[in-house]
């Protein structure tokens, strides 16, 4: 962000990776991302079958909930047809990415970089174009989950709900927009729940719907820094017990950039040990 000739703030979109930091750091609250709340409500009013695809980070975003069933009840009270935890897509992502790693590293690539964050992916490809081939092309858990649900219910629409505004960028991409119809941040979801006067704590929970889905702990761990790499490494270890996969992780775009600089300079050892 810089000032133009009149002193007005401008965003340099050639450098923007949609990380959302400007939203939280602007002292005047003058920057906002493009919301889809109106379009979602219109879908509810039309009677569209809309699934809520909830990122596993909801556990930390809504710590006051006694159970996942409370969140599911709240989302259904808003008008969602059903609720699916995106961690199940993370499990599919783990398997697919583990296969890719075994196929590519070290035979074709000296390391593989991965993250489900579209802001990270854009930063990496923009700042390190020569490392684009090292970035995993596996679909994100959001896309895996949305496609899985659309295969099961082709007429339904999908709304991803997560912590980060960058997912709106991912959902707008040509290859994804037919899979994910809406994106809400947890902040937007909390605002809708409050506007509808839904008392989440006192909602009745259907005994058969206490849990969302039976995703693995590794899939839910995608929300943590280094969680994706750990899940993939553990899956490879499960298939090849004698293989040692080195992991280097970072938190935040600044640390990620430093890590990629080290990888580019071959100062990180991330290749697996030779396979038998």
Where are these regions (language model features)?
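Glycine-rich beta-alpha junction loops
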Residues: 56, 117, 162-168, 187-190
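Short beta-strand/loop segments at the ligand-binding rim of alpha/beta enzyme cores
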Residues: 155-158
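Glycine-rich phosphate-binding loop plus the immediately following alpha-helix
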Residues: 182-203, 225-226
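Internal gly/pro-rich beta-alpha loop/helix module
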Residues: 169-176, 182
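Acidic/aromatic/glycine-rich contiguous surface patches that form carbohydrate-binding/processing clefts
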Residues: 246-259
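A conserved mid-domain beta-alpha-beta active-site/ligand-binding segment of alpha/beta enzyme cores
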Residues: 202-234
């Amino acid at each position: 962000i810089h000032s133009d000739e009149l002193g007005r703030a401008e965003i340099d979109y050639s450098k923007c990776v949609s990380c959302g930091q400007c939203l939280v750091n602007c002292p005047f609250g003058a920057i906002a991302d493009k919301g889809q709340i109106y379009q979602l409500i219109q879908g509810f009013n039309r009677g569209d079958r809309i699934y809520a695809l909830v990122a596993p980070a909801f556990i930390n975003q809504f710590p006051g909930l006694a159970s996942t069933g409370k969140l599911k009840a709240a989302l259904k009270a808003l008008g969602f047809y059903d609720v699916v935890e995106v961690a199940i897509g993370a499990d599919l992502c783990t398997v697919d990415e583990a296969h890719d790693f075994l196929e590519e590293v070290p035979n074709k690539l000296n390391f593989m970089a991965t993250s489900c964050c579209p802001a990270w992916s854009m930063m990496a490809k923009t700042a390190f174009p020569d490392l684009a081939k090292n970035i995993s092309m596996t679909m994100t858990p959001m896309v895996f989950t949305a496609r899985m649900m659309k295969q099961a219910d082709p007429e339904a629409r999908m709304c991803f709900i997560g912590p980060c505004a960058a997912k709106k960028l991912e959902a707008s991409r040509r290859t994804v927009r037919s899979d994910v119809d809406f994106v809400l941040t947890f902040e937007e979801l909390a605002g809708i729940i409050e506007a509808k006067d839904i008392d989440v704590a006192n909602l009745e929970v259907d005994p058969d719907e206490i849990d969302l889905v039976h995703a693995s702990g590794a899939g839910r761990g995608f929300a943590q820094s280094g969680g994706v790499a750990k899940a993939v490494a553990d899956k490879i270890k499960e298939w090849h017990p004698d293989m040692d996969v080195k992991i280097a992780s970072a938190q935040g775009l600044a640390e990620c950039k430093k890590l990629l600089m080290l990888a580019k300079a071959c100062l990180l050892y991330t290749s697996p040990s030779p396979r038998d």
